[in-house]
Regions:
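Solvent-exposed, charged helical/coil patches
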Residues: 1-19, 64, 92-103
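Basic, amphipathic alpha-helical patches used to engage nucleic acids or provide basic targeting signals
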Residues: 1, 23-94
């Protein structure tokens, strides 16, 4: 876990953003940095070692499994952690308000 991932984890663990996230979650053959199953939201922390093609394939797969995706750079987490946490909280609320009702 990178320093940025650890900082983000401390900020979101235990329903701090309105949802329960787990870290290093296997979803299919990928591992999400952080994932919530209610609502279905994956958070990825990017560094310079990630390849664009790999990121694109991961995003496509997670979305095909019904997850929304948020991506933050290590730099953004380091410089703007409160804003990152606010964005996550807003997405949790948005997904819950707009998910389809069961038939």
């Amino acid at each position: 876990m990178t320093i940025s991932e650890a900082r983000l984890w401390r900020a979101i663990q235990g329903r701090a953003v309105g949802a329960r996230f787990r870290r290093q979650v296997p979803i299919g053959h990928w591992i999400a940095d952080f994932a919530s199953f209610d609502p279905r939201l994956v958070i990825e922390v990017d560094d310079t070692s990630h390849e664009f093609r790999d990121e694109s394939m991961r995003t496509e797969y997670f979305e095909s499994q019904g997850f929304s995706m948020l991506r933050f750079s290590n730099m953004r987490i380091a410089m703007e952690l409160p804003e990152v946490v606010g964005t996550i909280e807003a997405w949790v609320e948005y997904i819950r308000l707009h998910r389809e009702a069961p038939e």
